[in-house]
Amino acid sequence: MEADAPAGYRDPSGRHGAVTLPARPEPIAFDADATVLIVVDMQNAYATKGGYLDLAGFDVSATGPVIERIARAVAAARAAGIRVVWFQNGWDPDYVEAGGPGSPNWHKSNALKTMRRRPEMNQRLLAKGTWDYALVDALTPEPGDIVLPKPRYSGFYNTPLDSMLRARGIRTLVFTGIATNVCVESTLRDGYHREYFGIVLADATHQAGPPALQEGALRNIETFFGWVSDVAAFEAALSSDEARRIPA
């Protein structure tokens, strides 16, 4: 392989993808038809005042621009023929899927701990069918998109994601959403261990907690598990690929 070749999946002949995305720690190439854009947990719970994160004491005041940039990434992906996968984190209204005291999730989930501390919140936080569980109004799945519920941080845990990706020949996962340091990183890590190439569009993500957690998560990803880029670079790379495919 050439020293200056981009990272990314190569087919048996050694050909890398047609789209090259500037990224850290190096550019990465992918084919649009072997890529999905994953939107992680853009629910009222995580991105809206009065949602779970806000009620649990996390700052959600900066999520507006993130939502706008995710909308741009979704539009660019759809225009390039990249399928969009939406995740919604949560459980049934009785929280059976959340696990009881025998599950570490029962002890570590801030949503469950908030409801135990504030019983009036019970069956309101991250319960399927509630406002908290719903995607934010500005981001709407369209026909052809994939919408998956997930009961834990990783989108690979107890979901059909892996089989759905493999059935479609997907090799590259482009991530947006909340929270960078929790569900985004957890899903990207699990994808890495399943031989998927993971890319995070940093300015289309937001952390749960102080800004240092965003910086740390992105540094961890680019050093050990994947690649980090941004929405403008993603749009430009896809536009360049589209221009190359249009006959003169």
From Swiss-Prot:
Organism: Methylorubrum extorquens (strain DSM 6343 / CIP 106787 / DM4) (Methylobacterium extorquens)
Molecular-function annotations in GO: hydrolase activity, acting on carbon-nitrogen (but not peptide) bonds, in linear amides
GO terms for biological process, alphabetical: nitrogen utilization; uracil catabolic process
NCBIfam families: RutB
UniProt keyword list: Hydrolase
Active site residues according to the UniProt entry: 41 (proton acceptor), 150, 183 (nucleophile)
Originating gene: rutB
Highest taxon of source: Bacteria
Paired cysteines (S-S): none
Listed name of the protein: Ureidoacrylate amidohydrolase RutB
Functional description taken from the UniProt entry: Hydrolyzes ureidoacrylate to form aminoacrylate and carbamate. The carbamate hydrolyzes spontaneously, thereby releasing one of the nitrogen atoms of the pyrimidine ring as ammonia and one of its carbon atoms as CO2.
HAMAP family to which the protein is assigned, alphabetical: RutB
EC number(s) per entry: 3.5.1.110
